[in-house]
Curated annotation (Swiss-Prot):
It comes from Homo sapiens. The gene is COX19. A motif (Cx9C motif 1) lies at residues 30-40. A motif (Cx9C motif 2) lies at residues 51-61. This is Cytochrome c oxidase assembly protein COX19. Disulfide bonds join C30-C61, C40-C51. It comes from the Eukaryota. InterPro entries: CHCH, COX19, Cys_alpha_HP_mot_SF. Residues 1-20 are annotated as: Disordered.
Length: 90
């Protein structure tokens, strides 16, 4: 009877994220960039549009230290801040 209860159930199959992993910054390599970004958000009533420069710098730090995949900054929404070239090469 116990096999009849489990007959129709499906097991959960986890799947990886679409863009790969996003490792935590355990060593604090980008901590100063993160704190600068968070301070900007706090000072600007959490209006993230006012802190795009800080956000860009934080993501650049993460990409340089292999804490996230390299992506062109234009693809991340910073095309207007890149002066015609992306520092993050594919």
């Amino acid at each position: 009877m116990s096999t009849a209860m489990n007959f129709g159930t499906k097991s959960f199959q986890p799947r990886p994220p679409d863009k790969g992993s996003f490792p935590l910054d355990h060593l604090g390599e980008c901590k100063s960039f993160k704190e600068k970004f968070m301070k900007c958000l706090h000072n600007n009533n959490f209006e993230n549009a006012l802190c795009r420069k800080e956000s860009k710098e934080y993501l650049e730090c993460r990409m340089e230290r292999k804490l996230m995949l390299q992506e062109p900054l234009e693809k991340l929404g910073f095309g207007d801040l890149t002066s015609g070239k992306s520092e993050a090469k594919k």
